[in-house]
Amino acid sequence: MNLEGGGRGGEFGMSAVSCGNGKLRQWLIDQIDSGKYPGLVWENEEKSIFRIPWKHAGKQDYNREEDAALFKAWALFKGKFREGIDKPDPPTWKTRLRCALNKSNDFEELVERSQLDISDPYKVYRIVPEGAKKGAKQLTLEDPQMSMSHPYTMTTPYPSLPAQQVHNYMMPPLDRSWRDYVPDQPHPEIPYQCPMTFGPRGHHWQGPACENGCQVTGTFYACAPPESQAPGVPTEPSIRSAEALAFSDCRLHICLYYREILVKELTTSSPEGCRISHGHTYDASNLDQVLFPYPEDNGQRKNIEKLLSHLERGVVLWMAPDGLYAKRLCQSRIYWDGPLALCNDRPNKLERDQTCKLFDTQQFLSELQAFAHHGRSLPRFQVTLCFGEEFPDPQRQRKLITAHVEPLLARQLYYFAQQNSGHFLRGYDLPEHISNPEDYHRSIRHSSIQE
C-alpha cells in the first residue's frame, strides 16, 4: 500500500495465506523426505532439525529452476502461483515461505547453525515438539498488585478488549519473545484492521489514588493480538505485561528529510510495518510503502538522486511489542542513531539482510518510570536513519537524506511525561480530538512480505 504525505488515503484488503493447522509442518516434512530438493536435508537422526537452502537471487551462480524450486512448490501448494498463468517471482516465493516459517510456532530457526555467507548458504530450523510450542505457554504473575478483578476471554482475531482496571501500569518485564503475542496463524489470513475507531477498541484502565489525591486514568488504542489459549478458557489479563498492552500499537510516525528540509511526514498503521524506499512500489508486498519523493531542482538534486537510485528495495521497519526492528534490503548503505545505538560519536551501520533492533519497549518504560519517580532524564525514543552517508558524524552534521522514525505510543507517552513532569505516575490519556484523524483511521492491506 502506498502512503502519501500526511498519512491520508489508503485501501483495505486481505489475502488468504495460511500455514495454520500444521499444514506447513507436514508439507515440509514431506518435502524433506522426498529428496527432490538438493540441500533440503535432515540434520539429525531424530528428524527434528533440518537444513534448507537459502541462496540469494542476486548471486551470479543462482539457478532459478533449482534454487527456487522449494519456494515455488510452497507457492503452488498455497495457490499463490499458477504455472503458465502467473509471472514467476522467486523473491516473493522465498519471502512467503520465510514468513510462514517465522510466523508458525511449529518451527524455530537455529541462527547459530545457519550459514548465510557461504557459496551455498542455508538456514537451519528445529521442529518444535507439540508440548514445547510457545503458543501453549501458560503465563502467570504472582504479584497480587497486578491481579485483575474480572478475567476476560480473548477471542480471535484481534478483538476489541473490554474495559478493564489495571492497578499497576509499570509492570515488571517478563522473559518473553514478541512472537508470544502473535497468533499461531500467519497474519494474512486475518481480516485485520489496525485501529479504525476509537471507542470500541479502547483499553481503559484506572490507577490507584495517589498521595496527593490525584488519580490517573488512561486509554490505549492499539492493535492487540490475542494470547494463544484453549477454546473457551478465560485468560487472566495479568499475563500481559505493560509493554504488551501499550506497544501492541503498531503505528510509526515517520519524517523524511532532504538536507534539513522536511519533504514528507506520515503515520503508518500496518501491523507488518513499512518499507522506506524510492521509485516504484512492490506489488507483492502489502507493507505500508513510504516513498521518498523526487527532489526539487536545487543545488543538491543530482547528489540526492544518485543516493536515491540505490534505495530500490529500501529498508523495512516494524513495531513488535518488545520494540522497533529494521531490516535493510537495499544496496545503499544505511547508518542509524537511536536509544540502542552502540556508538554516539561514530557511525552505526545497518547490515544488509540482517534484522536489527532499534528501540526497546521495556527499557523505554523503565527509563520513563525512573523519570517519574526519581527525576532522571527523559528516555530517547526517536531513531534516525541516514542513507548513503556515515552517521552519526560530528564533523559533518548535515546529511543529504535522512528519516526520523518514532513509535507513536512512545512519542505520546514521552510528551505527556514532559508536560506533566513530576506529576506523571502510571498512565496518560489520549486526546479525544486528534488533529489528523486520517492517520488513525486508515484502512490497510495486510501481509507478511518483507523481502
UniProtKB/Swiss-Prot annotation:
It is linked to Multiple myeloma: A malignant tumor of plasma cells usually arising in the bone marrow and characterized by diffuse involvement of the skeletal system, hyperglobulinemia, Bence-Jones proteinuria and anemia. Complications of multiple myeloma are bone pain, hypercalcemia, renal failure and spinal cord compression. The aberrant antibodies that are produced lead to impaired humoral immunity and patients have a high prevalence of infection. Amyloidosis may develop in some patients. Belongs to the IRF family. Pfam families: IRF, IRF-3. Interacts with the BATF-JUNB heterodimer. Interacts with BATF (via bZIP domain); the interaction is direct. Interacts with SPIB. Interacts with DEF6. Directly interacts with NLRP3 in the nucleus of Th2 cells; this interaction enhances IRF4 ability to bind to the IL4 promoter and is required for optimal IRF4-dependent IL4 transcription. Interacts with SPI1. Keywords: Activator, Chromosomal rearrangement, Cytoplasm, Disease variant, DNA-binding, Nucleus, Phosphoprotein, Transcription, Transcription regulation. This is Interferon regulatory factor 4. It comes from Homo sapiens (Human). Phosphorylation by ROCK2 regulates IL-17 and IL-21 production. GO terms for biological process: chromatin remodeling; defense response to protozoan; immune system process; myeloid dendritic cell differentiation; negative regulation of toll-like receptor signaling pathway; positive regulation of cold-induced thermogenesis; positive regulation of DNA-templated transcription; positive regulation of interleukin-10 production. Signal peptide: none annotated. SUPFAM superfamilies: SMAD/FHA domain, Winged helix' DNA-binding domain. The modification Phosphoserine is found at S447, S448. Its main location: nucleus. One of its GO terms (molecular function) is RNA polymerase II cis-regulatory region sequence-specific DNA binding. Residues 21-129 bind DNA. One of its GO terms (cellular component) is chromatin. The gene is IRF4. Lymphoid cells. Induction: Not induced by interferons.
